[in-house]
Amino acid sequence: MSSLLGGFLSATFNPLSGAPTAVEYLVVAGGGGGGFQNGGSGGGGGAGGLLTAAGFAVTAGSAITVTVGAGGAGKTSSANGSNGVDSVFSSITATGGGGGAGSGSAGSNGGSGGGGMGGGTNAAGTGTSGQGFAGGGGVNVGDYGGGGGGGAGSVGIPPIGPSGDATGGPGGAGFCSTINGQRVLYAGGGGGGSFISGRVGIAGPNAGNGGSSGIAGSNAVANYGGGGGGNGNTSASGSGGSGIVIIRYPASQSAPTATTGSPQILYNDGYQVYIWTSSGTITF
């Protein structure tokens, strides 16, 4: 604000209040890849673990590590999808999502668990407490379907419909965050595959739909931590999406003295926001 006093222009301003002592964070790990069962149906990949909270203490002058986890790979031969990779902010670690089940094994455990396969071993993987949910189990009767991967918002769902005519299970719901000033859904579970053409399991938000005969499981969208879609019959399974790390603190406080990893920087709703889609550091 400025004013004219006795012919002289005076000005007042609000200086920055110094380096932050605490920040709000969102840490999402990479999602798990969908499972592949040759001639059957794979489970959907579990979402990457998701952690978010305010009031996390930070210390000026010390570099804080930021790690953004990659998504787990889908498969083209009988195997579980690969687990996603952990994401890290300082001491906060979100666990990579579990791979969907493939030939002869249960869905893998992770931030959220991978879905069970159709045929053979039908158990789903478990999620990590406070980060995500379990996958849905598969079925082993007739034209079986794979279960959906777990998400940060709910468990994955088993295949839908009669056991001899099953649609792949839907992936678990994601988590809605507004840390970047918009409503964004992260960490949805991958859809389960189906042996029957066209009966794909629908994915959770920004995750990969399941495959079916002649249709490959879809890859999850990068930097949302979703699981990949399970395979159907002989089609490939989808890969999980990479994770993301976001922090914010009041815009009235000082900017960082250094960052690496090229974070996107936003200013909105009275906050400065830093978004990493690749690994780096931040120093206040």
Which residues fall in each region the model found?
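Low-complexity, glycine/proline-biased repetitive segments and flexible coils/loops
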Residues: 2-13, 20-284
